[in-house]
Amino acid sequence: LDPILVTRHLHYSLPYRALFARMMRRDTVDRLIDALVVLLVRLHLVGFFWGDCSLSNTLFRRDAGAFAAYLVDAETGELQPKLSSGQRSHDLANAEINIAGELMDLQAGRLLDDSVDAIATAEKVVERYDSLWTELTSWEAFDVNDRWRIARRVERLNDLGFDVAELDIVTDIGGRTVRLQPKVVDPGHHSRRLLRLTGIDAQENQARRMLNDLDAYSAATDQQGEDEEIVAYHWVTDAYEPVLRVVPKELRGKLTGPEIYHEVLEHRWYLSEQ
């Protein structure tokens, strides 16, 4: 029998060229680059060498004002126990070259704002990757009496959307200095928490926004001392679901439920500023 490959359609996703159907502004380009950097870091953390990182080989989904990126073309990829710094650098070099070429192609088609420097934007990939990779994997040394810095490091990673499942903590021979390094880092901190509390499957930034709204709902309804799961249930029934119910049926398939709710929160904020 001939082999076949069965693929799964990624709903609500778009190739980057569809996002550039109209003139694209600098801030939107930056958000695309940020999403691609997060994807590349996540792949490298699990030992996946992409081999051909580019905007063309990526799909994007809207994520509460940002984008979430997904690997599409993996025919050049290799899954290994751990990537060397040389392999990671090779992926980054390919990404920089490919993205610069893709942005220049968009400029030639007058689909990119003149203020966007294709070369400089592509170079930012390496800078942003190094910054995120360092935050997720680097050693940090501090005095043995400053153990509160362990919690602060974990909180910083949570803010970036990553859970820390394991830490490597070493104390020097003199017992005065502690060295800390995250060992097992999992993306999706906020989306996992939202799913646990509400059963709603959302992108990371959508989940972050909805959890903030859940906290605001808890304060507004004087439920801050109640069990978190109970408050979350009331928030879903009193806030989230009523918003989705009023969306016309013919428009419900345009965006995911969490993205619709984010748009409503944005609109509510703009109205409050007037």
Where are these regions (language model features)?
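Fold-independent oxyanion-binding glycine-rich loops
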Residues: 10, 74-75, 138
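Conserved kinase catalytic-core helix
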Residues: 22-51, 55-56, 92, 96
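Conserved structural core of kinase catalytic domains
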Residues: 1-33, 69
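Catalytic activation segment of kinase domains across protein kinase-like and atypical kinase folds
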Residues: 49, 55-105
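Short, well-ordered loop/turn elements at secondary-structure boundaries
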Residues: 37, 45, 65-66, 266
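A short, mixed-charge helix-start or loop-turn motif at secondary-structure junctions
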Residues: 21-25, 81, 250, 254
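Regulatory N- and C-terminal appendages and interdomain linkers associated
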Residues: 105-274
